[in-house]
């Protein structure tokens, strides 16, 4: 019996220190640490979710935000069905880099129909906030993205963020079932991964991603 109906590859991008790893750990393992080590290269988590009686396996790639790792992480855009852009609501520069750096990388390396989601993290730091929600919503609308505010620390909207993009991917693949594939990825081809543990980990998941062709990148 099949363990899941769909397998989607999602990558998480954004500046270093925005809480990408914390969001992923909160979602995948329900854990949080104030002293989590910055990702070196690329790491990943796998989690299965149930949406509308459909079992969806998510392989979520956590990428390093430092400039020196961008050559490594750019290769993981290829074949991604969804991309989550994360900024820190208390760090204006991390927000500016969404349009100045990360969305440009998406245009350069990802497929044109990739599903995108913008997350404003660390909303628990109310007194330190410098990026307003309306400003972020405007950027999201201009770039065909949905927007969610979250806090990995308090677990606010974390599951909602990941299930939102998972549902959008599921809805699109069921809406266009007969379209030709544009993004079929065999995970065995990406088995060697540089992770934040400083070693080459082996991804044992060898299934092929569901074949999809999306008409729009927005998660609706």
Curated annotation (Swiss-Prot):
It comes from Theileria annulata. It is found in: Cell membrane. Keywords: Cell membrane, GTP-binding, Lipoprotein, Membrane, Nucleotide-binding, Prenylation, Protein transport, Transport. One of its GO terms (molecular function) is GTP binding. It holds the Pfam family Ras. It is a lipid-anchor. Signal peptide: none annotated. PROSITE patterns: RAB (PS51419). GTP binds at residues 14-21, 62-66, 121-124. Protein transport. Probably involved in vesicular traffic from ER to Golgi. The keyword GTP-binding applies. Belongs to the small GTPase superfamily. Rab family. One of its GO terms (cellular component) is plasma membrane. GO terms for biological process: protein transport. This is Ras-related protein Rab-1. A motif (Effector region) lies at residues 36-44. Gene3D superfamilies: P-loop containing nucleotide triphosphate hydrolases (3.40.50.300). SMART domains: ARF, RAB, RAN, RAS, RHO. A lipid is attached at residue 219 (S-geranylgeranyl cysteine). The keyword GTP-binding applies.
């Amino acid at each position: 019996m099949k363990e899941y109906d769909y397998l989607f590859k999602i990558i998480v991008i954004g500046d270093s220190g925005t809480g990408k790893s914390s969001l992923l750990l909160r979602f995948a393992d329900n854990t949080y640490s104030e002293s989590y080590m910055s990702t070196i290269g690329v790491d990943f988590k796998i989690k299965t979710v149930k949406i509308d009686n459909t079992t969806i396996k998510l392989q979520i790639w956590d990428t390093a935000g430092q400039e020196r790792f961008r050559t490594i992480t750019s290769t993981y855009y290829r074949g991604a069905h969804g991309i989550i852009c994360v900024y820190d609501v208390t760090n204006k520069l991390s927000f500016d880099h969404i349009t100045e750096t990360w969305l440009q990388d998406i245009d350069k390396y990802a497929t044109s129909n990739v599903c995108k989601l913008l997350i404003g993290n660390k909303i628990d730091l109310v007194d330190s906030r410098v990026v307003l929600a309306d400003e972020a919503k405007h950027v999201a609308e201009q770039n065909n993205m949905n927007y969610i505010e979250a806090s990995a620390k308090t677990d606010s909207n974390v599951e909602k963020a990941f299930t939102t993009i998972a549902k959008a991917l599921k809805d699109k693949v069921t809406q266009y079932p007969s379209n030709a594939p544009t993004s079929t990825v065999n995970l065995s081809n990406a088995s060697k991964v540089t992770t934040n543990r400083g070693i080459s980990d082996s991804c044992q998941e060898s299934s092929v991603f569901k074949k999809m062709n999306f008409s729009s990148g927005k998660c609706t």
